[in-house]
């Protein structure tokens, strides 16, 4: 049994979100939530919300036991970048990339064999 949750266009860079995702990949959901709760990174709060959504999906849609769930897969892909302009001296301008990420979390019980 698997349950999936996604956060698309999350306002953080994929590189920063992957640092957090690597910490919780493969852990049980209670350990993962504990790590994400006390992490000082902005991306940790985003990943935590997606993980909580995946847990709720597993409980509501599949009737899964929350204690048996673990983080089977967590992926952070790049989303589109918003281009912005910062004016500089002598009429020049620099381009600012406001990056986004797509965060996908899959939780499964131990019987899934993943």
From Swiss-Prot:
It comes from Aeromonas hydrophila subsp. hydrophila (strain ATCC 7966 / DSM 30187 / BCRC 13018 / CCUG 14551 / JCM 1027 / KCTC 2358 / NCIMB 9240 / NCTC 8049). Belongs to the universal ribosomal protein uL22 family. The keyword Translocase does not apply. This protein binds specifically to 23S rRNA; its binding is stimulated by other ribosomal proteins, e.g. L4, L17, and L20. It is important during the early stages of 50S assembly. It makes multiple contacts with different domains of the 23S rRNA in the assembled 50S subunit and ribosome. The globular domain of the protein is located near the polypeptide exit tunnel on the outside of the subunit, while an extended beta-hairpin is found that lines the wall of the exit tunnel in the center of the 70S ribosome. Pfam families: Ribosomal_L22. Part of the 50S ribosomal subunit. Keywords: Ribonucleoprotein, Ribosomal protein, RNA-binding, rRNA-binding. GO terms for molecular function: rRNA binding; structural constituent of ribosome. It comes from the Bacteria. This is Large ribosomal subunit protein uL22. GO terms for cellular component: cytosolic large ribosomal subunit. InterPro entries: Ribosomal_uL22, Ribosomal_uL22_bac/chlpt-type, Ribosomal_uL22_bac/org-type, Ribosomal_uL22_CS, Ribosomal_uL22_sf. CDD domains: Ribosomal_L22. SUPFAM superfamilies: Ribosomal protein L22 (SSF54843).
């Amino acid at each position: 049994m698997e349950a999936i949750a996604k956060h698309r266009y999350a306002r953080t860079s994929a590189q920063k979100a992957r640092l957090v995702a690597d910490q919780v990949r493969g852990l049980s959901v209670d350990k993962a939530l504990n790590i994400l709760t006390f992490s000082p990174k902005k991306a940790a709060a985003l990943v935590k919300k997606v993980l909580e959504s995946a847990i709720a999906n597993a409980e509501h849609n599949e009737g899964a036991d929350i204690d048996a769930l673990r983080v089977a897969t967590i992926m952070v892909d790049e989303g589109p970048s918003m281009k912005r302009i910062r004016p500089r001296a002598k009429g020049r301008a620099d381009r600012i990339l406001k990056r986004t990420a797509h965060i996908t979390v899959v939780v499964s019980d131990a019987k899934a064999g993943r």
